[in-house]
Every structure is written in C-alpha cells, then in structure tokens.
Amino acid sequence: VKIESNEGKPQHEQLITVKLPPEADYLNDETLEVYEQDKKKYDQTEQLITNDSITLLIGDYGYYDPVQDAIECSAVIVNGTKTEIKDLSFQVSIENNVMQGRVFLDNSVPELTKEQTGNFKPSMGIPVILGFPEEKPTDEIENGRKIDTKNIKINLSDIQYKVVEQEGK
C-alpha cells in the first residue's frame, strides 16, 4: 500500500495503545528512557489519528546534536489502518520553528523491521527517534541543546507498508 501524503486527509479521535518494540531489550538506557517517556505520554490516550493511514505523534524528546549536525526528536508512529501492517517505510520532513535560519533536510525512514515494530496492529503506536540532518552545518554550535518539541511540526509523505495476511482468511 502506498500513500503519497496525509495532507488534508480526514482524522478521527481514537484510543491508542503504545507498546515498546521487541528491540527494546537491546537498546541503550538513554533511548529506552525516551521510549518510556513517550509511551507514558500517549499510551491509553485519545489522539487525533489520520483515517486509514499512519500518524506521527511528536514526543517530548528534542535535541540538536552538534556531532551529527542534526535535530533529533522522538515520536510515536500510530497504525491508523484497520489491519496489521509490516515493512513500513516513509519520508519525514520537519518544519523548523526552533532554530531560525537553519535548514534541516528531509529524511527517509527505511523499512522498519519486525524487531522495531513487533506485530503492528491497528490503533497501536510504537516509539521511534527521528533525525534531520542540517543542510549547511556551520559548526558554530559546539554544545548540544534541548529543543522544545512543541515547536516542531513533522510531515509524513511517501508512506508504504504491506498488509499482514491473517491466518485462515
């Protein structure tokens, strides 16, 4: 299934369940802490979900990494379709209202593995950390800085996934 964009698509309020991915067992403590925070923020909450598509809910972790020259932010990917899905991939672009005068490039999220999503069922969310490299890094920022994720807007495009066939259908 391929979806160009969620722009202007209808949305509905929906109760979502956030699960940590199977790979959580192997993640470093910092990443796990970010995932746990976002799980706590969104698990068992009503959220505005795009009909029959994937929705990205922005988490609380935002950081400018001077080593990578990139903004990192956490998010929860929600399956707003009516079926279990796999092999999800998409493009993300960031609207930078945080660091004026700097341009951050779009990024591709390659096919997420079963280790990253588990069984990705409808109304389920999984935490991720997204990165957006800076177009022309200047190296003038030496120290990392926290970013208020309320000022970040992320757009999804080129969403692709496969429907998991149910046994016995």
Language-model-derived ranges and their functions:
Residues 1-72, 84-86, 126, 132-169:
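Membrane engagement elements in two modes
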Residues 79-83, 98:
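Short, acidic/polar linear motifs in exposed loop/turn regions
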